[in-house]
Amino acid sequence: MDNKYKGTKTELNLQAAFAGESQARNKYTYFASKAKKEGFEQIAALFLKTADNEKEHAKMWFKELNGIGNTAENLSAAADGENYEWTDMYEEFAKTAEEEGFTELAVKFRAVGAIEKHHEERYRALLKNLETSQVFEKSTVKVWECRNCGHIVVGTKAPDVCPVCNHPQSYFEISEENY
């Protein structure tokens, strides 16, 4: 993922634009939720519409920075980002919070850091599956479920096409029953 703006002020501007639009999108979704809870459906809908616009603005700047690669590159970048968050960022935030007497916040920072570690592990496992061609084929029998229609297939490989709804193999995942 080559970035033609590397080392320029324009790169910093693009990064700031991406960060600003991303934060605005999240804030507007939170504001929409609050407006909805307070009984203001139209206002909630406008916040969500604007949030969708901000998402597209952020995507535009992120693409300009060549931040979106192929799935393997994206999984690797995501894992690296999660690693930074749990090994450096949240631990430093927790230490600072403790030094400043905010012990409850330090506990929250560390708890979120533990979640980020899980995110990293999940992305790395998915990347390994992708690199070893084990996304839709396993060495042991699994229960595969079509994400579109719910059709169940038992075997080592998801079908190329769902025999019920004709959606492609990409719609199959290993079925989890955690209830």
Predicted ranges, named:
Residues 1-179:
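Non-heme di-metal
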